[in-house]
């Protein structure tokens, strides 16, 4: 459910259409996007925009009740993992709910993206900088 204003019309549109438990992916520049899934490509060049920049804007608009991460992020990108967990903690406080964090293998994560409403590709070029956001409700 939308909570504010996003300038990108594709992102705004997909968020406004989300129902409870629908998913939306924010990913790095390297994650393969299934041909059956809508791709919203924000990547301009390596690192622009960053994963966290895209995630920050998306979560200003989207009510989130769960987040799915690849287990591999813990070992291969611990700094981003900590930044992401901190962001989710702040989002919980802002939304007034608990956001469940789930982990799965990267291979399974890639399969889950096929069921997503869209995949938003950032310019991030660090490993496992991907999250599946599960939509909540604002009431």
UniProtKB/Swiss-Prot annotation:
Annotated GO MF terms: D-ribose pyranase activity; intramolecular lyase activity; monosaccharide binding
Name of the protein described by the UniProt record: D-ribose pyranase
Catalytic reaction list: beta-D-ribopyranose = beta-D-ribofuranose
InterPro entries hit by this protein: D-ribose_pyranase, RbsD-like_sf, RbsD_FucU
Active site residues per record: 20
Subunit record text: Homodecamer.
Top-level EC class as recorded in UniProt: isomerase
Keyword Transcription: no
Biological classification of the source: Bacteria, Pseudomonadati, Pseudomonadota, Gammaproteobacteria, Enterobacterales
Organism: Citrobacter koseri (strain ATCC BAA-895 / CDC 4225-83 / SGSC4696)
Family indicated by similarity: Belongs to the RbsD / FucU family. RbsD subfamily.
């Amino acid at each position: 459910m939308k909570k504010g204003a996003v300038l990108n019309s594709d992102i705004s549109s997909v968020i406004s259409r989300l129902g409870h438990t629908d998913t939306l992916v924010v990913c790095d520049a390297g994650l393969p996007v299934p041909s059956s899934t809508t791709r919203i490509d924000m990547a301009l060049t390596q690192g622009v925009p960053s994963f966290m920049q895209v995630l920050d804007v998306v979560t200003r608009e989207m009510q989130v009740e769960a987040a799915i991460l690849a287990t591999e992020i813990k070992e291969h990108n611990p700094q981003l993992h900590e930044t992401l967990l901190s962001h989710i903690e702040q989002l919980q406080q802002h939304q007034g709910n608990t956001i469940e964090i789930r982990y799965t293998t990267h291979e399974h994560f890639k399969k889950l993206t096929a069921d997503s409403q869209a995949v938003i590709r950032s310019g991030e070029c660090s490993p496992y900088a991907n999250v599946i956001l599960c939509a909540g409700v604002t009431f």
